[in-house]
Amino acid sequence: MSDSKEPRLQQLGLLEEEQLRGLGFRQTRGYKSLAGCLGHGPLVLQLLSFTLLAALLVQVSKVPSSISQEQSRQDAIYQNLTQFKAAVGELSEKSKLQEIYQELTQLKAAVGELPEKSKQQEIYQELSQLKAAVGELPEKSKQQEIYQELSQLKAAVGELPEKSKQQEIYQELTRLKAAVGELPEKSKQQEIYQELSQLKAAVGELPEKSKQQEIYQELSQLKAAVGELPEKSKQQEIYQELTQLKAAVGELPEKSKQQEIYQELTQLKAAVERLCRRCPWEWTFFQGNCYFMSNSQRNWHDSITACQEVGAQLVVIKSAEEQNFLQLQSSRSNRFTWMGLSDLNHEGTWQWVDGSPLLPSFKQYWNRGEPNNVGEEDCAEFSGNGWNDDKCNLAKFWICKKSAASCSRDEEQFLSPASATPNPPPE
């Protein structure tokens, strides 16, 4: 019996050895001794023991690598946390973030409120129609201004501004469209312009007289006003005035009659030139003297020279009537005007340019507190309702005086103020 058991044990040992080799175990001397010790236990228990032992060995070998991987992973997480903390530190404070968020919300809402493409196309079409309508009007400054404004609005709409801006543009376009609609038709404007041209040509052929010049000036002003394209009510008013002017011009004498009147006036003027006149043209006659009120300004000494060049002298006042007449002329024009009075020769001693002294009765004409000789004021002037002393080197107007010419009685009657001025043409 013992002999038969030994071959079986050897066979079982060989089988166990092959199974263990299939599981990946290498046969060692210790292993053989251990197998020998366990040879008397069940085969399943031996296999389970060896399996647990192998698993423990594998886990023990993996512990160091798992620890290193966990450490590297923690380091990576720490670095990410550090970077995130730094990034959060750079963010603005909470109020700033809320403000940005609100602005984003508003922008999103504004973009959502933009008009649809069809609405934008409608605005663009109205712009094109307005542009075409303005292009048909005559080339006037007001229309060019409208056209430029339309072009600017067209460019602005093309840039799609925010809703409030688009509404403003749309309202302005509506007003412009209404304004263009109120303009007269092209044919009506041409008719007005043609009538203006005809009236201008007709008036241009009339003799140069005050009434006709007034009509001509009014026509020119009306033409300029029509060129600026005022509002409809103003255009109707201008058109009515043009109609009235046209009727008035039609009532004027014929061209041949006007030429006859003009020739007679020319002959009359030539005859008057040959007659004796008390004072030259642009001079004023008063009590046997002629007075010239300048339209330019000079200092006191140059004013004396200017009067001498026309055979006169800087005015010397001889009577209260003459003083009142000259003071009235100066105050009416609201001018500071030199007279021929100074104290240049001796301070405080006033005398006229003809060498005569200032009479005591004339001292009443000085303004209150004058003469005061502030800053070497040595020359007298008409100032307001009286006299004033001022610096002689200042530029002021001046009055020249000379005796009037003597004429016969018939010439004096003929040259009365009523006959000396040519009659205007009949109105």
UniProtKB/Swiss-Prot annotation:
Give the comment on domains. Answer: The tandem repeat domain, also called neck domain, mediates oligomerization.
Protein name, per record: CD209 antigen
Cytoplasmic side stretches: 1-37
| sequence repeat feature ranges | 96-118, 119-141, 142-164, 165-187, 188-210, 211-233, 234-256, 257-280
Covalent S-S links between cysteines:
279-290, 307-400, 379-392
User: Which residues are noted as glycosylation sites?
Assistant: 80
Which gene specifies this protein's sequence?
CD209
Q: Where does Ca(2+) bind?
A: 370, 372, 374, 377, 388-389
Q: How does it assemble?
A: Homotetramer. Interacts with C1QBP; the interaction is indicative for a C1q:C1QBP:CD209 signaling complex. Interacts with ICAM2 and ICAM3 by binding to mannose-like carbohydrates. Interacts (via C-type lectin domain) with CEACAM1 (via Lewis X moieties); this interaction is regulated by the glycosylation pattern of CEACAM1 on cell types and regulates contact between dendritic cells and neutrophils.
Q: Positions of the region 8 X approximate tandem repeats?
A: 96-280
Q: Which residues cross the membrane?
A: 38-58
Classify the main location.
membrane
Q: Give the Extracellular compartment stretches of this protein.
A: 59-427
